[in-house]
Amino acid sequence: ACDKNGWIIDFTVNPGNEHDSRTFKGLYDKLADIGMKYCIVDAGYKTPAIAKLLLDDGIKPVFPYKRPMTKDGFFRKSEYVYDEYNDAYICPGNHFLHYSTTNRDGYREYKSCGQICEKCEYLSQCTESKNHVKVVTRHVWEDYMETCEDIRHTEGMKELYSHRKETIERIFGTAKENHGFRY
């Protein structure tokens, strides 16, 4: 972690096979009392748990845009509208996907009715499932992720995020150069 001038504030050493999002809490606990207003991180840290932690502590997380991981030719999750009142998703064919269960990772699963989807004109763009059931997931802390998206679109946040390359990325680049890790 570094400050806005590129000075290293703190660091943690973690195994290379651990994902950034899993090691974040250890570093954050060391930095929690320095009075951060913003926490500018890369896409590896864009998780509901980190968003909740930062927002609950009054820190604005500045996450980058992350491209949806949807197959070409299929509807993206954003094309399914979440209906908060009914706690259901509405598909592009104007049918409901109702809440089914919450999995161990904290994702609520919303499933369509296979009999309805079987006759739908959008089936080939929606799912390849043999039983014609579309499943859309929503994390229990998805509201925090939506707040982070609102922050990302706030005036000045794009410029603030662009300073990462001048601060923390420069530190990593210098370290790689000095220790012979460029090839």
Where are the language model's segments positioned?
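Anion-binding and metal-coordination hotspots
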Residues: 1-183
